[in-house]
Amino acid sequence: MTPIVKQFKYGQHTVTLETGAIARQATAAVMASMDDTTVFVSVVAKKEVKEGQDFFPLTVNYQERTYAAGRIPGGFFKREGRPSENETLIARLIDRPIRPLFPEGFFNEIQIVATVVSVNPQISPDLVAMIGASAALSLSGVPFNGPIGAARVGFINDQFVLNPTITEQKQSRLDLVVAGTDKAVLMVESEADILSEEQMLAAVVFGHQQQQIVIENIKEFVKEAGKPRWDWQPAEANTALINQVKALAETRIGDAYRITEKQARYEQIDAIKADVIAQLTAQDETISEGAIIDIITALESSVVRGRILAGEPRIDGRTVDTVRALNICTGVLPRTHGSAIFTRGETQALAVATLGTERDAQIIDELTGEKSDRFLFHYNFPPYSVGETGMIGSPKRREIGHGRLAKRGVLAVMPSAEEFPYVVRVVSEITESNGSSSMASVCGASLALMDAGVPIKATVAGIAMGLVKEDEKFVVLSDILGDEDHLGDMDFKVAGTRKGITALQMDIKIEGITPEIMHIALNQAKGARMHILNVMEQALPAPRADLSDFAPRIHTMKIDPKKIKDVIGKGGAVIRSLTEETGTSIDIDDDGTVKIAATDNNAAKMVMSRIEEIVAEVEVNAIYTGKVSRVVDFGAFVTILGGKEGLVHISQITDARVERVSDYLSVGQEVNVKVVEIDRQNRIRLTMKDLDNNLSTNVTPEAVVQEESTEN
């Protein structure tokens, strides 16, 4: 059980790969570490293909264990449950660059499980998990055309930084993860603080160059510990069947792909498939329907790609750099805080913005502790958006991933908490989809935020680019359709403002994408983005000056932090009383910032006035109106300035002799008092003498006579 270990320097960090001691029944397993952040990655690959399997069943599970950070999970059950949003996103991050590296026709089931078992608060586990997965797959012997490397690139003080720490990332204007082989970039995921196309491309190239050391060391690791390569060969092509399907379907498929309307085109393609299947299976019952459909799909790809490379119009008749027709409506929902419908061709998003208070912020429980998120973005992709029926329930991996990409696109222009003290939630409902619904969500979100009066720094638009490449010939496509995404070689999404890029996501299905191609794609995307921004700015040039009548107004005031306890009161009594009386929501920060949320301005002003009274300093000789809070034998306690108690001694109630305080004062009675003294213990002495209090005694004349006769 002697482990095989490979260790190397990667930028400022040390990476360790270890295998052979743990999970020996798995096909391959690697313990990957980077400066005490450790992820255990296992790969299990089935030797046999499941009967009837016609797709590649690759599953990636990423899971974080709280023991990695020396913590016990919260909640009733005290154990980890379903994957968090962050775990889902990292699982997708691992999946995307490795999936294209398996050969076409490989249908053996593979499961990758990455478990975070130790975490250094300065090192994010996502990169470690990607490196570990690459190493484990390379060791396993499966037909994987890797290994891949992975790098995170930051941009601090106008310099690229390789694999910045968590602390360094807070100062960075860029968070970019790039993965690829020794020859080509395969995946990019990033958010940026409005960087230029040239800066983004340079960051991708920098990250790809730097990760070569990872690839080299994994190759050396495989030489030492790798399993024999599987003797896998793709199934032989059924040339006779291919020719039969071509004869029956090729011309008809070409005609179908001249139908510009999606549903009509799909109906025609489905009819062709049904007809060809019926004809061929009638001749030979042993022919598989799946095999026929695969050949037809390949014909569809050949037709679409061939026409594009030949310079012919695209599926819907557009040129390569034309954006589909745009339609924008804002303020479409009467009772919401902000709303917009953004339509691009047959893709449509209904975006809705909602404003809330600090207590609406999302509390995220991460390995390193809790953090609060003030900007929430949720993306929903219902089945009706593509004319289908299906399950409606919790969000799927794709919805979580698209929502995060759209959020990244808008995040750079969001105002700070000081500029706009609201928690903001955007929901994008995809009501129609035919390509790039995530970028439609970016556009819709930008418009909905402006409709809600959120002072975003600039309008943001997003565009999806595609690529068709054969040998040295390639064509970059702007605003791709769903079919072009499916049949093309690249999905390249760019969001940004007029000044630069805020988010970039790239998934490449082939090797050989050069920096030149990426440069052309970025510049072509910029032109498309400017066109969309022109149309958006015509519809809504700037954020609305006023918030919706239905949105809460947040009024901010500052108090001495030492006075916070007075505003809250014992057991929260004072602040609870204020909120219940006025129907407002009150949040107090540790620095003494008080935020009052109210739909009624008068209620907010009342709360502010009451808080000013509570925190005001009591002044000697000042006269206040207060309420009697307690009556005792030696006097009465009166509450002034919203919560401070002072004593009116029995001798200070009136000039006349007072036998019983209760004869003159009762709890809840409003009286005028003057501050006589504040002693060293901050006790307040009050007097009611010489003040207009209109005191009426509760003593009856008979009682007075009786007392006098008793004295005699």
Curated annotation (Swiss-Prot):
Reaction equations catalysed: RNA(n+1) + phosphate = RNA(n) + a ribonucleoside 5'-diphosphate
Gene Ontology molecular function, alphabetical: 3'-5'-RNA exonuclease activity; magnesium ion binding; polyribonucleotide nucleotidyltransferase activity; RNA binding
Claim: Transferase is one of the keywords in the record: yes
Domain called S1 motif: residue spans: 621-689
Major site of localization recorded for this protein: cytoplasm
Single GO cellular component term: cytosol
Subcellular locations according to the entry: Cytoplasm
Record CDD domains: KH-I_PNPase (cd02393), RNase_PH_PNPase_1 (cd11363), RNase_PH_PNPase_2 (cd11364), S1_PNPase (cd04472)
Residues covered by the KH domain: 552-611
Annotated S-S bridges: none
Family: Belongs to the polyribonucleotide nucleotidyltransferase family.
NCBIfam families (alphabetical): polynuc_phos, PRK11824.1
Name assigned to this protein: Polyribonucleotide nucleotidyltransferase
Organism: Haemophilus ducreyi (strain 35000HP / ATCC 700724)
